[in-house]
From Swiss-Prot:
The keyword S-adenosyl-L-methionine applies. Pathway: Cofactor biosynthesis; adenosylcobalamin biosynthesis; precorrin-2 from uroporphyrinogen III: step 1/1. Homodimer. Pfam families: TP_methylase. Gene3D superfamilies: Cobalt-precorrin-4 Transmethylase, Domain 1, Methyltransferase, Cobalt-precorrin-4 Transmethylase, Domain 2. It catalyses: uroporphyrinogen III + 2 S-adenosyl-L-methionine = precorrin-2 + 2 S-adenosyl-L-homocysteine + H(+); uroporphyrinogen III + S-adenosyl-L-methionine = precorrin-1 + S-adenosyl-L-homocysteine + H(+); precorrin-1 + S-adenosyl-L-methionine = precorrin-2 + S-adenosyl-L-homocysteine. This is Uroporphyrinogen-III C-methyltransferase. One of its GO terms (biological process) is methylation. It comes from Methanobacterium ivanovii. S-adenosyl-L-homocysteine binds at residues 10, 85-87, 115-116, 166, 218. Keywords: Cobalamin biosynthesis, Methyltransferase, Porphyrin biosynthesis, S-adenosyl-L-methionine, Transferase. The gene is cobA. The keyword Protease does not apply.
Length: 231
């Protein structure tokens, strides 16, 4: 028995890796999230498909339930795929699932995916680094675990470009915190449904972006913008 944690990429089914496709074709069982484009499941023909539905604020199953289910399916099948949107280790809680497998002595392999933090800005021609302008970037969650005793995100980032994932529900709160450290006129770009049908680009500033009509899934990019979005 072996479990593959597979990254499905940022949304466009053509952005999944060849290795991910090959693993899906051999799968006995696939546990998949909502962020993983369901069109990708066509590669798992004949496999048992289990929807575990993890979205911010709308969890069909809790993380503990997913861990338990993953272990149970692994013990009953030769090859189980845990399909996750983006990359399993970029705010995908893949590490928690690996620890659950290790505790039960279950073998696993990892298949990286294209993270939306880079893939989505690239799709619209917005680089997160650029020679002479941006030599660093930070990827941060905009939705910390509400059960934490203390928040870890301080928002005083020194990177030239900041990419915020899962941040639309807390956009007003997050931008207010960022404005304690950055100019309110700092340019902001939000990309809805990145790489997928219905992709939409919304631009503004730290001061006004939260007032725009924005719906998840979407990511937020700060600063590395002006010279590219005008083209």
């Amino acid at each position: 028995m072996v479990v593959y944690l597979v990254g499905a990429g940022p949304g466009d089914p053509e952005l999944i890796t060849l290795k991910a496709v090959n693993v899906l074709k051999k799968a006995d069982v696939v546990l998949y999230d909502k962020p993983a484009n369901e069109e990708i499941l066509k590669y798992a023909e004949g496999a048992k498909l289990i929807y575990v539905g993890k979205q911010a604020g709308h969890h069909y199953k809790s993380q503990n339930e997913i861990n338990t289910l993953l272990v149970e399916e692994a013990k009953e099948n030769d090859l189980v795929v845990r399909l996750k949107g983006g990359d399993p280790f970029v705010f995908g809680r893949g590490g928690e699932e690996i620890l659950a497998l290790v505790e039960e002595g279950i073998d696993f392999e990892l298949v990286p995916g294209v993270t939306s933090a880079i893939g989505v800005p690239t799709t619209i021609g917005l680089p997160v680094t650029h020679r002479g302008v941006a030599t660093s970037f930070t990827v941060v969650t905009g939705h910390e675990d509400p059960t934490k005793c203390k928040k870890q995100v301080g928002w005083d980032f020194k990177a030239d470009t900041i990419v915020i994932l899962m941040g639309i529900g807390n956009l007003a709160e997050n931008t207010a915190e960022i404005m304690k450290h950055k100019d309110p006129e700092t340019p902001v770009c939000v990309i809805e449904n990145g790489t997928m049908e219905g992709q939409r680009i919304i631009t503004g500033t730290l001061e006004n972006i939260a007032g725009k009509d924005i719906k998840p899934p979407a990511l937020v990019v700060l600063e590395m913008l002006s010279m590219f979005l005008k083209k």
